[in-house]
Amino acid sequence: MRLTMRRTLMTGFFQRLQKETQAAQQQMLQAPVFAACARGEITLDMYLSFLTQAYHHVKHTVPLLMACGGRLSDRYEWVRIAIADYIDEEKGHQEWILNDIRVCGGDAQAVRNNQGVGQVSTPIELMVAYLYHQIDRANPLALFGMVWVLEGTSVGVGGNIARLVKQQLNLPAKAMSYLTSHSELDQDHIRFFESLMDKITAEEDRQAIIHSANQVFYLYGQMLRELLPQTQQQAA
């Protein structure tokens, strides 16, 4: 009994976060686009659609982090300091995406202006709105649910997907700056994130992060499902 209790005490929140969001993560990874990519059926239009939606959530990363930092109580001053580091790392990444779109021949201006083929999808619009709502009206730490989804996914499958897309579409490295850099950068980010999460001890805050992660996994998965044309989804 004593050994079991000691092991429980040594288990940090990050491990619990992984466990309690695993089902939602696996559901997201069942999006047909992953199988299509593995079969060599990825198209340039699909890649451009992904970059478009990436832009529409990445452009909110720094504003969301700033909003979160401003809503934290004094007892989470150490999280506010960590957020400042996150902001420094994340600023300007939406411009990388627009550059990738230009290199691929896409309409970066339409994406920036949220017009025509560059419009935000409903799942991403809802995901961003949900996160702002959680920060403003519920628990600002819920933002770290999104951080887990995006950085955990980058580390878990991002590198392999980036290689497949580059090979199948025969793209130059300068068309892959966002996808490639994030699969590499987030290796360090996830270690930092783990240490940060393991310092969260209040149960209500842990629950807020877990719930947010599950919601974001669902909405991000819905966006991924929309990347594949309906005819290909039926075939998959």
Ranges and model annotations:
Residues L3-A236:
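Non-heme di-metal
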